[in-house]
Amino acid sequence: EIFMPTEFLHGLYDGGHGAGLYDYWEMMRKHPRCAGGFLWVLADEGVKRVDMNGFIDNCGNYGADGIVGPHHEKEGSYFTIKQVWCPIQIRVDSLDSQFDGKLRIENRYDFLNANTCRFTYKYVQLPSVTDKGGMKVMKQGEVNCPDIPAHGVGTLTIPAAMKGANALLLTVTDKNGNDLFTWSYKLEDIAGLQQVSAGNKPSYRSEERRVGK
């Protein structure tokens, strides 16, 4: 039997699409009989009321459950879904100013080699809370993904952290030129920002039971 839940997360007012998706997906990936799953739903549903000056009527809370809004505006969970389901994953949680340019990456494609993708890197200087200017790009470039077969892991090499940059942006692009995801890493403490602990990650256990046993 193949397990493929038709609605394992519901996004009412963006309260459920991204929340918990990582835990569900990591558990589902470990079971060979799991073929994937469905999120409900892609876009907020509503009727444009001509008698209310174009107001989008969601019939209370029955239709505001999309990954994107009624005008296809991206909601918070949109970016979480892109990250969790990105076929190329960076297996690094944090970096610092001593970053040597090497990153462990995982190819989650079922058939494609990772070398069909490219990475764009940007070393940037983010402004402090009192700065009036915007983000400054200190150095940028492109590199090919290394030769990593489907479901394999390997090392991506980019130039090491440069002096003056306090953050790194990494964007992976597929063979068709589609941006799959952009990661951002803090390299140095940014003036005016307070460090906040992320807390402990949740844990889970899984077991399989046969009906009638």
Regions found by a protein language model. Give the residues of each.
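Extended substrate-binding grooves/exosites of carbohydrate-active enzymes
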Residues: 1-104, 108-116, 120-137
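Hydrophobic residues positioned within well-ordered beta-strands of beta-sheet architectures
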Residues: 101-103, 119, 141, 154-156, ...
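Intrinsically disordered, low-complexity Pro/Gly/Ser/Thr-rich segments with frequent PxxP/GP/PP motifs
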Residues: 122-124, 128-164
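Short, compositionally biased segments
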Residues: 166, 205-207
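Terminal connector regions
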Residues: 161-200
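Conserved small/polar residues in nucleotide/adenosyl-binding loops
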Residues: 208-213
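Extracellular ectodomain segments of secreted/surface proteins
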Residues: 85-98, 186-204
